[in-house]
Amino acid sequence: MKLKMFLMSSTPPGSPPGQADTDTAAKTPTTSADSTSRQQRSPAKQPQQTETKGRRYGRRPSSRTRPQKEQRRSRSRHRTRSRSRSLSRVRAVGSTTVSRSRSSSLTKAVRPRSRSRSRGRATATSRRRAGRGSPRRRRSTSRSPSTNTFKRSQRGGGRRGRGRGSRGRRERSSSTSPTPTKRSRGESSRLRGVSPSEVGRSVQSVSAKHTGRLGRLLDEAIDPPVILVRGEANTLKCFRNRARVRYRGLFKYFSTTWSWVAGDSTERLGRSRMLILFTSAGQRKDFDETVKYPKGVDTSYGNLDSL
């Protein structure tokens, strides 16, 4: 009765009871097969659902799988290994090239010496052959050893050169040693006295013309004539520079500009001054007549006992 009631409840309301039994009997094996297939598929879908529940977002269709990642990792490792091997080979080749270049440079550095020696020997033999033939070449060969010896003395003769210099200094000192004795003799003769013919030789006389020793002494007894010029310092300096160029031979000396100072203080009194010295009164007169003094400059005559 319970089975009938269950079947009746499972059949639709509009269908007759006889049909319901046949339908149920026909459908029952299919439902059992469907249930078994669903049960087999459900455990495969459950882990996916659990994974999606654990992750926030589902896996994309373009995302890489584990075998693809492993393949790419193996490829990258293979590439890095090949690169490291190539670098090691390049380094080994570079070291060999450096060693080769060093050896070649050493051989190059050694070879020119042998060439220079062979060249020097060839030049020496050529010079000897040339010396046998012509006299001009003999002269050149005879000059060459002197130059070589001179160069050797310049290069490696430091101590010898110093010794020679010290000898030269000693010789100079020995040659200059007798001069002080001569000076001492001259000083002793001066202290003893001076002959009348030597009097006044070192002193410049006032006049070039004289009549004997007595006339010269009389001319020297006269005081040398002087012109005192007063004015501004710059005007006096300019006048002095012009007179040196234009009026040569009309004067003897020019002094620098100077001024008087008070005894109690260091203040300058009046305008600056300058002295012009002459050998004779006639020279002073000629200078005064020919020279044109600048404006604001005053002159006065005078004589000095000595300079």
Curated annotation (Swiss-Prot):
InterPro entries: E2/EBNA1_C_sf (IPR035975), Nucleotide-bd_a/b_plait_sf (IPR012677), Papillomavirus_E2_C (IPR000427). Its main location: host cell. Belongs to the papillomaviridae E8^E2C protein family. GO terms for biological process: regulation of DNA replication. Residues 38-51 have a biased composition (Polar residues). Plays a role in limiting the replication of viral DNA in keratinocytes. Recruits the host NCoR/SMRT complex to viral replication foci to mediate repression of both viral replication and transcription. Residues 74-88, 110-141, 152-170 have a biased composition (Basic residues). The lineage of its organism: Viruses, Monodnaviria, Shotokuvirae, Cossaviricota, Papovaviricetes. Keywords: Host nucleus. One of its GO terms (cellular component) is host cell nucleus. Coiled coil: none annotated. Pfam families: PPV_E2_C. This is Protein E8^E2C. GO terms for molecular function: DNA binding; DNA-binding transcription factor activity. Residues 1-208 are annotated as: Disordered. It is found in: Host nucleus. Residues 20-37, 89-107 have a biased composition (Low complexity).
